[in-house]
């Protein structure tokens, strides 16, 4: 069990609870937030306890990185879910949206199942995978949006590749509209 930690004079931003104020934060022995906001000040801290003065710094909810290229599966020698988690947490990132540019490419439900299990077992952060817009990232045939979305994919993208065929892109956008799913397109003419 850890000691209580006290942080004072921080700019606290928490959109979910409509907080945007200067105040403090108390983290309990269980590692959970006990109190936050402008009511947390030196009056809330036992006289012998030390506190960290965060004047000029911010306390915010965890950051979501919306475009992460992780090496798993296939390129684990570059990065895996464990190393991604450590690097992300050190910068305040608690959730990532991973791109489908892996080996194998995330374009079918069996790979999604593997990825979700692996992320759950190895990552210390939230992993939200995307699937490719097109099979094998080739820009010619759409993936099965409905099946992939049902497996927990939060969006579709070909990562750093772009869809150059306007007819295909139109079909993709119609399908995305019908299924109410997110499409992320890298903007670049080739």
Predicted regions and their residues:
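Hydrophobic/aromatic beta-strand patches that form the interior of the parallel beta-sheet core
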Residues: 7, 50-52, 64, 97, ...
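Divalent metal-coordination and catalytic microenvironments
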Residues: 10, 25, 31, 56, ...
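Histidine/acidic-residue-rich, glycine-tolerant segments that coordinate divalent metal ions
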Residues: 102-113, 118-190
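Active-site metal-binding motif and surrounding structural segment of the metallo-beta-lactamase
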Residues: 41-59
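N-terminal metal-binding scaffold of metallo-dependent hydrolase/deaminase domains
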Residues: 1-45
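A generic structural signal for alpha->beta connector loops
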Residues: 30, 48, 93, 124-126, ...
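Metal-associated gating/positioning segment near the N- to mid-region
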Residues: 57-119
């Amino acid at each position: 069990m850890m000691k209580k930690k006290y942080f004072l004079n921080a700019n606290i931003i928490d959109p979910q609870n409509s907080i945007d104020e200067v105040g403090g934060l108390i983290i309990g022995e269980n590692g959970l937030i006990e109190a936050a906001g402008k009511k947390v000040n030196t009056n809330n801290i036992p006289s012998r306890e030390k506190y960290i003065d965060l004047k000029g710094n911010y306390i915010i909810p965890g950051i979501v990185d919306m475009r992460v290229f992780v090496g798993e599966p296939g390129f684990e020698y570059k990065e895996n879910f464990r190393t991604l988690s450590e690097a992300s947490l050190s910068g305040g990132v608690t959730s990532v949206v991973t791109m489908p540019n892996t080996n194998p490419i995330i374009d079918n439900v069996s790979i999604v199942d593997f990825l979700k299990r692996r992320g759950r077992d190895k990552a210390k952060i939230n992993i939200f995978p995307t699937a490719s817009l097109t099979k094998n990232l080739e820009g010619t045939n759409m993936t099965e949006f409905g099946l992939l979305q049902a497996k927990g994919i939060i969006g579709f993208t070909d990562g750093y590749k772009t869809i150059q065929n306007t007819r295909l892109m139109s079909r993709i956008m119609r399908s995305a509209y019908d299924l109410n799913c997110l499409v992320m397109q890298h903007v670049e003419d080739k």
